[in-house]
Swiss-Prot record:
Organism, scientific name: Saccharomyces cerevisiae (strain ATCC 204508 / S288c) (Baker's yeast)
Lineage: Eukaryota, Fungi, Dikarya, Ascomycota, Saccharomycotina
Protein name, per record: Lariat debranching enzyme
GO MF term list: iron ion binding; manganese ion binding; RNA binding; RNA lariat debranching enzyme activity; zinc ion binding
Enzyme Commission number: 3.1.4.-
Pfam family, one: Metallophos
């Protein structure tokens, strides 16, 4: 049985060299098809980017990324990553729909769905904060003039425009990525062990506040095979069984959270050994069905004696164009692209209507040509060209021109 080997990394915090050293060690023994990094990537290109990243001045350092950005080092395996809450937003805001940040390294944008070698991967960058969910992000040019500092702790908060196209997805997702945890997963794993490692989570767990309520709703709706997260700097596994289509939150209090202007980075060490593991996925259902069980995995950040990297082995759809592609290209997802276009046309409705009252299935059917033949060549993500990562605006304009106009 054919399976893809996918390396999964928790928070990066600029430690690309260490991550790729471990990936290369494993890759030399048994090849790895793809590396996924689950946020706090910190794509800092120069000193100017520090004005847009939530890192105290005494901890600011360029990190390893600049060597990849300047083509001094090449990533050893294809890499995709999502944004977290410690990102160079001055950089990533130029790529709202994703794009190359270096050779072999692709940012997924605020949200996305792509295909790679027969695996369908969805993503959502940032973290949940209720008070910013219905707000628009400021314009990059306005921020560049004088406002980065004033907005440094809200630019990475998830917006309704980020997540709406994901709620409209009708066909199954193999792997879903988010930086913070869906807030219901904690009740489906070994909570006692989690509290041994992170006792200060107890109150949030009791109140149903450890994580994002909106991604928990999305998990119950999409029912992916895997949901992967980071953010809380601890390894945690859970298994969520899906008996019925459900949008219900976990059976805990979901009262509104008071705004905290002093968000801190959780950073308590655990006594667990740093090691890699392999997990085998179960045999799949047919393409259009959703999975009866979602396996959740959260990983730590890249530090000694932490569990920050693991290998998943996943069975691909060998009938899909992305599997058959001889150049092993990534492909944008037609359903997600269609949803983006619909959301753009209905942005006034989405901004004025309560989120939980939107009929996502009905909305997704507007202007949809069900059963149409797909020209997958039209959705192939262009191959990397030298220094394209340094022309972020051109990458974004090309995407908008191709799909959004």
């Amino acid at each position: 049985m054919t399976k893809l080997r996918i390396a999964v990394q928790g928070c990066c915090h600029g430690q690309l060299n260490q991550i790729y050293k471990e990936v290369s060690r494993i890759h030399a023994k048994t090849p790895i098809d793809l590396l996924i990094i689950l946020g706090d990537f910190q794509s800092i290109r120069d000193g100017q980017d520090f004005k847009s990243i939530a890192i105290p001045p005494k901890y600011q350092r360029l990190g390893d990324f600049i060597s990849y950005y300047n083509n001094e080092i090449e990533a050893p395996v294809p890499t995709i990553f999502i944004g977290g809450n410690h990102e160079s937003m001055r950089h990533l805001m130029l790529l709202p729909h994703g794009g190359y940040v270096a050779k072999n390294i692709f940012y997924m944008g605020y949200s996305n769905v792509i295909w790679f070698k027969g695996i369908r991967i969805g993503s959502l960058s940032g973290i949940w904060k209720e008070w910013d969910f219905n707000k628009q992000r400021p314009d990059w040019n306005d921020l560049e003039n004088n406002n980065w500092k004033a907005n440094i702790r809200n630019l990475y908060h998830v917006r309704i425009s980020d997540i709406a196209p994901l709620f409209m997805i009708k066909h199954r997702i193999d792997i879903m990525l988010s930086h913070d945890w869906p807030n219901g997963v904690v009740y489906h794993g070994d909570t006692k062990h989690l509290l041994k490692l992170k006792p200060f989570f107890e109150q949030d767990i009791k109140e149903g506040k450890l994580g994002s309520p909106v991604t928990w709703q999305l998990l119950r709706d999409l029912r992916p095979q895997w949901w992967l997260s980071a953010h809380l700097h601890v390894r945690f596994m859970a298994s969520i069984k899906h008996n019925k289509r459900s949008h219900e939150p976990p059976n805990k209090s979901t009262s509104k959270t008071k705004k905290n202007n002093n968000e801190i980075d959780l950073d308590l060490s655990s006594d667990e050994d740093e090691r890699s593991g392999i997990m085998n996925c179960q045999e799949e259902n047919e393409y259009d069905s959703k999975y009866g069980e979602t396996r959740f995995l959260a990983l730590d950040k890249c530090l000694p004696r932490r569990r920050w990297l693991e290998i998943l082995e996943i069975e691909p759809d060998t009938s899909h164009a992305s599997w058959k592609d001889e150049n092993h290209r990534m492909f944008w997802d037609p359903e997600f692209i269609n949803n983006l276009v619909i959301c753009q046309k209905n942005k006034n409705l989405l901004s004025n209507k309560p989120f939980n009252s939107v009929n996502w299935i009905e909305l997704s059917q507007s202007n949809r040509e069900e059963g149409r033949d797909i020209d997958w060549e039209n959705y192939a993500i262009p191959a990397y060209t030298l220094d394209i990562q340094k022309d972020e605006v051109r990458q974004t304009k090309a995407f908008i021109s191709k799909f959004m106009t």
